[in-house]
């Protein structure tokens, strides 16, 4: 069972594994509220995921460690598991969807893991990881629906409360729900008056639909530039914790996410991946009731492939009206281009 004590224990265990990312004020982001950023894009491995995987692996039995670990991931959990497993001298195998950014794939290998590329999206990688677990007797490290993983992610909530106890609202992206489950449990346990909001991509609203239906819902297809939250179905544990602790969930479009990524680059000199920028997008485009409030947006990661980043920047420029694309029909005869 997830408790505040477990999250505090995770914080103690992880103190020499992770770095504490200090909250920074994001001036010029929003005129109606005070925006602060919890920059987990500056975390070791470039993402919050190392917190959950690090704590989970630290709690394995010697027999479980000896079998080696296997995980599935859109990229960030992969790096967290690879780093933590290598730290504890454990063999690791990671299944990634074949659409995962090359930067995340290479980083996972560099942290010491063997990588298995799987056709499809996260859920396909998940199924392949389960198959290999059964075939080769690995210990499976779930990316979000595990209480030790959730407790590790919850250490972010403790750090926010230690650094900014007067915060009014905390905003997190939601894919499978591990991050917001841990953060919301910590925040609400320490101060139930603080609002906790979740943000999903419009093209991958699995938690939104699950809350509407009263049970975890599986979406047939998902599509978003925010690959870190491109999940077809939330976890059973995370679904229950979101119902219990999270005040509301909103969705943002890929154009809005692109604009938030661009805003972070220009105003904060900070690189965020799509999932990391989603909370800021929700604030920027007035999706949340935070006028006049102190708001912490968790920038969950910064592992965005440079080729994707260039397209996202262009999309953000188009969204904000700073770049235009024109289509002109010309007759196929000499002199037409000169005339234009």
Q: What does each model-found stretch correspond to?
A:
Residues 1-340:
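PLP-dependent amino-acid enzyme catalytic core
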